[in-house]
Amino acid sequence: MTFKFFSDPGHGWLRVDVASAQAVGLEPSSFSKFSYQQGHWLYLEEDVDAFRFIKAYMDKNNNIPVIREHSSDRPSVIRNYPRIAA
């Protein structure tokens, strides 16, 4: 499975759909208030939440998820999404 990692000059987020998180035993409430949710997409902050998902994914699937990076030199619109209610 392929996931996207978005970054701006200040931070980065791994985009994961809710169903993929649930497939590895995680719910939106498993993540901190520093991550965001827009519809069925979770944007997991890079410092803790993205690692939590990647570790759960690797434990469940015995492989590393494919991650494609997208970076911007401007503040990301992700910062305007609602925060996950932890």
Where are these regions (language model features)?
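Short, compact, well-ordered microdomains
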Residues: 43-86
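N-terminal acidic leader/helix
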Residues: 3-30
